[in-house]
Amino acid sequence: MKSLNIIFAGTPDFAAQHLQAILNSQHNVIAVYTQPDKPAGRGKKLQASPVKQLAEQNDIPVYQPKSLRKEEVQSELKALNADVIVVVAYGLILPKVVLDAPRLGCLNVHGSILPRWRGAAPIQRSIWAGDAQTGVTIMQMDEGLDTGDMLHKVYCDILPTETSTSLYNKLAELAPSALIDVLDNLESGKFTAEKQDDSQSNYAEKLSKEEAQLDWSLPAVQLERNIRAFNPWPIAYFSTEDRDGNAQTLKVYQAEVLPHQDKPAGTILSADKNGIQIATVDGVLNLLQLQPAGKKLMSAQDLLNGRAEWFAIGKVLA
């Protein structure tokens, strides 16, 4: 088994876990590409990505171009003479000249079973859609968006209580060892490239804060999925009014679906120690864990202890 000279391109913690797996293997990471440092925290100080931090701890040269389209950036990358580039949640588009630079091309770790959920938010969209199963695909990159030939897939179930955070953690456990298996056998023929069936593909659009607003004209089943899919970001929310008529926005972290009651969508049906029950177009959404603006996360019961007037029975939420 030949050790490969690898350029690793990635940015968040999910990517750093893959970089660590490669560092623990017999392969050589000759350079790391990651997003430029970004302002973070209250002081808006520039913060290095998790991948950059790990690379610097291991004395690996770090490159942070804003784009890979400039000729000098491409020449610099080519001169590294890598066998393969591994891309995990990098955040920049790789032009054809970069894809063609390494001897064995570019590999990507994608957080779904392709061709389902190509695009930016595969983990979140699999929960949002109510999928029972997902996984990770390791593919040979081409110029399309997650359209390359598939080399290896690993599967995992999506539990009924799964959030994007918990599913992300599951895939971060599964994927690095699958990547090492592919790298170890890249030239042995163990993994045969499988074309994607474009007719079976769909696109995982980025999440937005607007989409996170709970819309009572949707079925309760969909809203409960949204709450789990939009955790840890952007977090599902809705608004009610206090006794003075001021809007109060609450984030929702946990809810359950109850049988339908024939009331207008958005009607508060009950609010007690068992939760805050709101009618939807199909089914009742029972809110269990909420967070008022500027306060800590709390149970519905604790919220009602101080703010019961926000949830008058019969009130219709927008």
Curated annotation (Swiss-Prot):
UniProt binding sites for (6S)-5,6,7,8-tetrahydrofolate: 112-115
Pfam families: Formyl_trans_C (PF02911), Formyl_trans_N (PF00551)
Protein EC: 2.1.2.9
Class of enzymatic activity (EC top level): transferase
Catalytic activity annotation: L-methionyl-tRNA(fMet) + (6R)-10-formyltetrahydrofolate = N-formyl-L-methionyl-tRNA(fMet) + (6S)-5,6,7,8-tetrahydrofolate + H(+)
One GO cellular component term noted in the UniProt record for this chain: cytosol
Keywords for the protein's UniProt record, in alphabetical order: Protein biosynthesis, Transferase
InterPro entries: Fmt (IPR005794), Formyl_trans_C (IPR005793), Formyl_trans_C_sf (IPR037022), Formyl_transf_N (IPR002376), Formyl_transf_N_sf (IPR036477), Formyl_transferase-like_C_sf (IPR011034), GART_AS (IPR001555), Met-tRNA-FMT_C (IPR044135)
Molecular-function GO terms, alphabetical: methionyl-tRNA formyltransferase activity
SUPFAM superfamilies xref list: FMT C-terminal domain-like (SSF50486), Formyltransferase (SSF53328)
UniProt function note: Attaches a formyl group to the free amino group of methionyl-tRNA(fMet). The formyl group appears to play a dual role in the initiator identity of N-formylmethionyl-tRNA by promoting its recognition by IF2 and preventing the misappropriation of this tRNA by the elongation apparatus.
Protein family per UniProt: Belongs to the Fmt family.
HAMAP family registered for this protein in UniProt: Formyl_trans
NCBIfam families assigned to the protein according to its UniProt record, in alphabetical order: fmt
Protein name: Methionyl-tRNA formyltransferase
